[in-house]
């Protein structure tokens, strides 16, 4: 199977996670951010992730891909209950996290930005909706304090380092991509249980953290 992705994209990370958790091989293909032609040819519009199944048919939508791959062998992993507290935490933090993440994505060495045109496409599109990246970076300190406070609240909710609620569930698929991308932000205080969970999930899913390129 082949998975077409952007490295920074949280929806792509969700799809990548299930392959790592189940130890199923997948061929990753990173599309350029300004390449509309390839995904449109596959699924009719510019979006990622896109899974090319073994029968060569294409499947978009991250959670559809997660459920498809999880059930392929008849032994699904994501059988745990979801937590309303985790859902509420994600809703709160996702409300502002992009103000920290988007301007940092734009400065980072992701393969989807490997041409100047691809990087410019991302900057132009995201600044139009999120605001000027230089302004957002200038306001980082307050947002970093907010995220550090919110991570302290999350620390109390983590049951085990290998599954946020004690048993693997969709909450892990929703939570880890955000934590992984937040490793791109320098200066965040990571509480110990959150850090252990983040690091353990990175190993389980075979997805790299971004700490070495933090801004």
From Swiss-Prot:
InterPro entries the record matches: GLR_AS, Glutaredoxin2_C, Glutathione-S-Trfase_C_sf, Glutathione_S-Trfase_N, Grx2, Thioredoxin-like_sf
One Gene Ontology term, aspect cellular component: cytosol
This protein's record includes keyword Magnesium: no
Disulfide bond residue pairs: 9-12
Residues in GST N-terminal domain copies: 1-77
Gene3D superfamilies the record matches: 1.20.1050.10, Glutaredoxin
Family named by the database record: Belongs to the glutaredoxin family.
Protein name: Glutaredoxin 2
Source species: Escherichia coli (strain K12)
């Amino acid at each position: 199977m082949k998975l077409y992705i952007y490295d920074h994209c949280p929806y792509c990370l969700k799809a990548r996670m299930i392959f790592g958790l189940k130890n199923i091989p997948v061929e990753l293909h990173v599309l350029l951010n300004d390449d509309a032609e390839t995904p449109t040819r596959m699924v009719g519009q510019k979006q990622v992730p896109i899974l090319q199944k073994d029968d060569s048919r294409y499947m978009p939508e991250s959670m559809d891909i997660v459920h498809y791959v999880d059930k392929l062998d008849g032994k699904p992993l994501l059988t745990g209950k979801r937590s309303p507290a985790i859902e509420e935490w994600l809703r709160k933090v996702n409300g502002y996290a992009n103000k920290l993440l988007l301007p940092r994505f734009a400065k980072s060495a992701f393969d989807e930005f490997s041409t100047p045109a691809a990087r410019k496409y991302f900057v132009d599109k995201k600044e139009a909706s999120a605001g000027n990246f230089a302004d957002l970076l200038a306001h980082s300190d307050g947002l970093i304090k907010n995220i550090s406070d919110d991570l302290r609240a999350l620390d109390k909710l983590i049951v085990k380092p290998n599954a946020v609620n004690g048993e693997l569930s969709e909450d892990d698929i929703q939570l880890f991509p955000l934590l992984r991308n937040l490793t791109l932000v320098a200066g965040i205080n990571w509480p110990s249980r959150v850090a252990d969970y983040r690091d353990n999930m990175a190993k389980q899913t075979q997805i790299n953290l971004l700490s070495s390129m933090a801004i």
